[in-house]
């Protein structure tokens, strides 16, 4: 028996379950913080790789043309979407930090509302980032292969370095999408663990 009179046998199953859930919640919060920080870095990297990618070439022996991400609308969308997504994840990271610091000091109107909001926002963010990246990939393939039926010439045979950097940015964008899928999965777990596994739409007792 311990000095305080609380030995291993005196710990009730309810208390033991609460301690395990608390430990699980801390581990989940740390995993989410790590993934969000990593996602922010990758999203910023993607936006910077595209935003600062330029290459100037002499065309037809007389005309200088500089290729930038603004020449392809899909690349512009990726830059803007990834920048907004990075800002969103930064806000979520700040929200998690504040929640950890103020835990137990704030009165929540509904403890299930915030997990629902985070879940829906994470879902929307990952779909938007993935869709923008895929649209840019499809447009970039045309720049590589050309499209004779539409009289679109190949571009990457002239702007090789520019296209290679775009390819690296798109790979980075898909990595960011994967990280955000993991974040969305964590949000789903954090939300649906609040519900009873035996009865649909019934919250667990707090």
Curated annotation (Swiss-Prot):
Stretches in topological domain Extracellular: 53-71, 133-161
UniProt topological domain (Cytoplasmic) ranges: 1-31, 93-111, 183-206
Predominant location: membrane
Record field: transmembrane: 32-52, 72-92, 112-132, 162-182
Membrane topology: Multi-pass membrane protein
Keywords from the named record: Cell membrane, Membrane, Transmembrane, Transmembrane helix
Pfam families: CASP_dom (PF04535)
Protein family according to the UniProt entry: Belongs to the Casparian strip membrane proteins (CASP) family.
Coiled coil: none
Protein name per Swiss-Prot or TrEMBL: CASP-like protein 2C1
Subcellular location as annotated: Cell membrane
């Amino acid at each position: 028996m311990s000095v305080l009179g609380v030995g291993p046998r005196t710990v009730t199953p309810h208390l033991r379950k609460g301690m395990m859930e608390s430990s699980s919640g801390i581990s989940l919060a740390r995993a989410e913080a790590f993934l969000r920080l990593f996602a922010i870095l990758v999203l910023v990297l993607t936006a910077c790789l595209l935003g600062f990618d330029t290459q100037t070439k002499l065309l037809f022996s007389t005309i200088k043309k500089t290729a930038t991400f603004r020449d392809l609308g899909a690349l512009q969308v990726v830059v803007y979407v990834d920048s907004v997504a990075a800002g969103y994840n930064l806000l979520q990271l700040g929200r998690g930090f504040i929640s950890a610091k103020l835990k137990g000091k704030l009165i929540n109107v509904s403890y299930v509302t915030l997990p629902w909001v985070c879940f829906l926002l994470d879902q929307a963010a990952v779909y938007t980032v993935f869709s923008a990246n895929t649209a840019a990939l499809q447009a970039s393939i045309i720049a590589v292969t050309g499209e004779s039926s539409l009289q679109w010439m190949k571009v990457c045979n002239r702007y090789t370095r520019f296209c290679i950097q775009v390819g690296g940015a798109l790979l980075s964008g898909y990595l960011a999408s994967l990280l955000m899928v993991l974040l969305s999965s964590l949000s789903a777990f954090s939300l649906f663990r609040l519900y009873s596994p035996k009865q649909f739409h019934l919250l667990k007792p707090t």
